[in-house]
Amino acid sequence: MVEDGAEELEDLVHFSVSELPSRGYGVMEEIRRQGKLCDVTLKIGDHKFSAHRIVLAASIPYFHAMFTNDMMECKQDEIVMQGMDPSALEALINFAYNGNLAIDQQNVQSLLMGASFLQLQSIKDACCTFLRERLHPKNCLGVRQFAETMMCAVLYDAANSFIHQHFVEVSMSEEFLALPLEDVLELVSRDELNVKSEEQVFEAALAWVRYDREQRGPYLPELLSNIRLPLCRPQFLSDRVQQDDLVRCCHKCRDLVDEAKDYHLMPERRPHLPAFRTRPRCCTSIAGLIYAVGGLNSAGDSLNVVEVFDPIANCWERCRPMTTARSRVGVAVVNGLLYAIGGYDGQLRLSTVEAYNPETDTWTRVGSMNSKRSAMGTVVLDGQIYVCGGYDGNSSLSSVETYSPETDKWTVVTSMSSNRSAAGVTVFEGRIYVSGGHDGLQIFSSVEHYNHHTATWHPAAGMLNKRCRHGAASLGSKMFVCGGYDGSGFLSIAEMYSSVADQWCLIVPMHTRRSRVSLVASCGRLYAVGGYDGQSNLSSVEMYDPETDCWTFMAPMACHEGGVGVGCIPLLTI
């Protein structure tokens, strides 16, 4: 009964002690250490561990299923555990009580195996993270094998990527020399190996054979057939490969060396060689610094500004500007140098070229193209720069030129089948693919690719959407295009191409409509840089992760507002 003048109180009050569950687990842990109230014993060999069923069932899925589903063990006072390390089981029982676990190099594998058996996914993930963060050329092959055995897909992929990135160092390890033939064959055949030259792959394979010459000598022909000997220097083939005693005494090996030498001596025979043996390797999982070159400001003026993006730190930093302002510029990276090619300076289309050395932070003029051009596609294949199409101030171009850094000369090669300006151009599976673009009258969805061995162009499946001023890049076994302009609107849509199916399919669109966008691959992801959304130039950047099929905004450019050329210089030094 409430008296007159007294404050009316609610009939229901909720009271709680938030720390009670965690405090209760601590008390139960202490009781277990005293050996009191325990109702089950887990046995491994001569080791026995007492515990409480209720705690094990609450914390460990394996025991939850055992004790709540009327399994035979739920009535046993002592349960025999098979296939686990005793110290790992003890650590996981302690974890069930206090939520703490110490992971180190000595126990990580046994803990991961135990966690997998007991269905403790969070601990399994923590162990995988521990191993992934400590990958090294001396242990990565063993970690990969362990990850495969334990069906840890993320760790397996991380170890695989590490092996590809650090192949030269890995090939010098004891783990590599102890690999079975099947694993070595699989490894030396990978496109993703990060090597400065194919000669490093040859030396790795030969070292593996010589480690057990008597047993492995007969495997050399099979190994050499999976190495891209035609991509070795002629001098190396003659002075090193051909002179090796293991090669000289094997007829099949000598035939492979002759085939490689013919590649250099008789170019007309190149189309008849197995395609994979003449396809350069490309390690797309390496992190690289992304350079944004030239472009436009908000007033539409061409810029000479250059800035560099670190995708790991997610930050931009300004570096030395070019000697010439260039928008719609072609950008290529060869031998650690960044080339700015052609473009538009605000008054004229340019044929001039300059190269940036990041080690000295300097720009140097190099040989000019034969034609003035802006809005062309620029790629690198077999150490040569190719520029495709573009606009010379009067019309769209079909012409193609290639530049040799060794001779500092440009050479005209076979023209495309169509005049194409603002097309997407990328190297994919050893061929130059040109997608979309326009000829001044119409915008294309068509695609063609160039075989540099035969100097011929061939059609490929057209994109689902016609587009020009879009970004194009390859990543792994797929080719991607994004953004652009279709004649009526600015695009955010993106597509992916598979050469096996010769077919395009849509992927998730970007968050922003982007015409004049540049697309570049780094560290296994794609970066869409800048562009124009129909109202203003863009400084924003989006990153696409093919594993999640998601675009994520990254740090925006600091000094640019769209229309930039981009190039990526790998961070990893071989």
Swiss-Prot record:
UniProt-listed SMART domains: BACK (SM00875), BTB (SM00225), Kelch (SM00612)
GO molecular function, one term: ubiquitin-like ligase-substrate adaptor activity
A GO cellular component annotation in the UniProt record: cytoplasm
Kelch repeats: 289-336, 337-383, 384-430, 432-477, 479-524, 525-571
Matching CDD domains: BACK_KLHL18 (cd18457), BTB_POZ_KLHL18 (cd18247)
Top-rank taxon, per record: Eukaryota
Gene Ontology terms describing biological process: cell division; positive regulation of mitotic cell cycle phase transition; proteasome-mediated ubiquitin-dependent protein catabolic process; protein ubiquitination
Metabolic or biological pathway: Protein modification; protein ubiquitination
Residue ranges of domain BACK in the record: 140-242
Residue ranges of domain BTB in the record: 66-105
Record flagged with keyword Secreted: no
Gene3D superfamilies, A to Z: 1.25.40.420, Kelch-type beta propeller, Potassium Channel Kv1.1, Chain A
Pfam families attached to this UniProt entry: BACK, BTB, Kelch_1, Kelch_KLHDC2_KLHL20_DRC7
UniProt keyword Repeat present: yes
The entry's keywords: Cell cycle, Cell division, Kelch repeat, Mitosis, Repeat, Ubl conjugation pathway
UniProt function note: Substrate-specific adapter of a BCR (BTB-CUL3-RBX1) E3 ubiquitin-protein ligase complex required for mitotic progression and cytokinesis. The BCR(KLHL18) E3 ubiquitin ligase complex mediates the ubiquitination of AURKA leading to its activation at the centrosome which is required for initiating mitotic entry. Regulates light-and dark-dependent alpha-transducin localization changes in rod photoreceptors through UNC119 ubiquitination and degradation. Preferentially ubiquitinates the unphosphorylated form of UNC119 over the phosphorylated form.
Quaternary structure and interacting proteins, as annotated: Interacts with AURKA. Interacts (via BTB domain) with CUL3. Interacts (via kelch repeats) with UNC119.
Full protein name: Kelch-like protein 18
Organism: Homo sapiens
Encoding gene per record: KLHL18
